[in-house]
Amino acid sequence: MLSGELRAIRREKGSRGYIKELRKRGLLPAVVYGKDKPDMLISVNAKELSGLLKAMGSASAILDLQVEGSDDRHKVMLKEMQRDPVGRMPNHVDFQLVDWNKPVHAEIPIHLVGTPAGVKAGGIIQHGLRTVEVEGLPGKLPPRFDIDISHLELHDKMTVADITSPAGIAIISEPDQVILSIIVPRAVLEPAESAPVLEENGDKGANGKANSNGKANGNGKANGDGEKAEE
């Protein structure tokens, strides 16, 4: 399992105004718990955490937490990230201390490899799951699942049951959950609309021409008000 270093600052349990001030400074209030130890209140740099998780490609990565002003270093995993309900920005983080001898639950990202044969034939990928839930010892967790999809034809699909997990890792997600399907684009499925047929409102005259209210004159021509013209 990949790991990365994250700096943290100890904080006090403050008021709502104090927490709001932390966020204005780009810091996320966080808590570290686990291994029967007292909870530790900290704050971390929001951009640093986001960049680290993105670079490591998994929210289940093991982080080496370095507490500023001390020699304290802790191996932790991100357990929960709370987000603002409106802007969806992170506003609080829970970290769990890693016990190397105790299995943990983790979300492992799925990485698709190759271009499906069905896509080359004109199909498109319809995505399902992006991550798979697993259980295993922290040191054995894979950073991601690489899945070859180049063999998939039109109308084929791939489910969790098609994933092979490494030794010591159990997949918890339901096996019939769909990861992706190769489907025919909607534009191909729907027939093209035929051109509309224009309807003629009047009866045709002797030469095929109609007047404005449908009455024809003697030679097949109609005058403006539909009355028969003088011969």
Swiss-Prot record:
InterPro entries with a match to the protein in the record: Rbsml_bL25/Gln-tRNA_synth_N, Ribosomal_bL25/Gln-tRNA_synth, Ribosomal_bL25_b-dom, Ribosomal_bL25_C, Ribosomal_bL25_long, Ribosomal_L25_dom, Ribosomal_uL5_bac-type
Please give the SUPFAM superfamilies that the UniProt record associates with this protein: Ribosomal protein L25-like
- Chain residue ranges for the region called Disordered: 195-231
Which keywords does this Swiss-Prot/TrEMBL entry list? Ribonucleoprotein, Ribosomal protein, RNA-binding, rRNA-binding
Q: State where composition is biased (Low complexity).
A: 207-222
A GO biological process held by the record? translation
Entry's Gene Ontology cellular component terms: cytosolic large ribosomal subunit
In terms of superkingdom, the source organism counts as Bacteria
Question: GO molecular function terms here?
Answer: 5S rRNA binding; structural constituent of ribosome
Pfam families, per the entry: Ribosomal_L25p, Ribosomal_TL5_C
Give the family this protein belongs to, as stated in its UniProt record: Belongs to the bacterial ribosomal protein bL25 family. CTC subfamily.
- PANTHER family attached to this UniProt entry: RIBOSOMAL PROTEIN L25/GLN-TRNA SYNTHETASE, ANTI-CODON-BINDING DOMAIN-CONTAINING PROTEIN (PTHR33284), RIBOSOMAL PROTEIN L25_GLN-TRNA SYNTHETASE, ANTI-CODON-BINDING DOMAIN-CONTAINING PROTEIN (PTHR33284:SF1)
Function description:
This is one of the proteins that binds to the 5S RNA in the ribosome where it forms part of the central protuberance.
| Entries under HAMAP family matching the protein | Ribosomal_bL25_CTC
Subunit composition and interactions: Part of the 50S ribosomal subunit; part of the 5S rRNA/L5/L18/L25 subcomplex. Contacts the 5S rRNA. Binds to the 5S rRNA independently of L5 and L18.
Protein name listed in UniProt: Large ribosomal subunit protein bL25
Q: Which organism is it from?
A: Heliobacterium modesticaldum (strain ATCC 51547 / Ice1)
